[in-house]
Amino acid sequence: MYSLEISLRYSPFPLSIQKKDYEDVKRIYNEIKDFMQGNNQNTHLIELSCEKVQDKLIAVVAKEVISVQIYEKSA
């Protein structure tokens, strides 16, 4: 299980989701990183879903993300 954790501007607590496949997490990571680099000039909404907690959904305005990280969650 892989976790993707994002930190938001003016928020002391990170948001995280879990995915089973590294490729899924890496794709989301790269998408968020592109938004952070300013490659997309429009205000975008990033929608994330978690595979560990079935009904966990997160929506974030992309320009508010200040950091993103991936790590493997060991059991």
Where are these regions (language model features)?
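Short, mixed-charge low-complexity intrinsically disordered segments
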Residues: G38, N42-A75
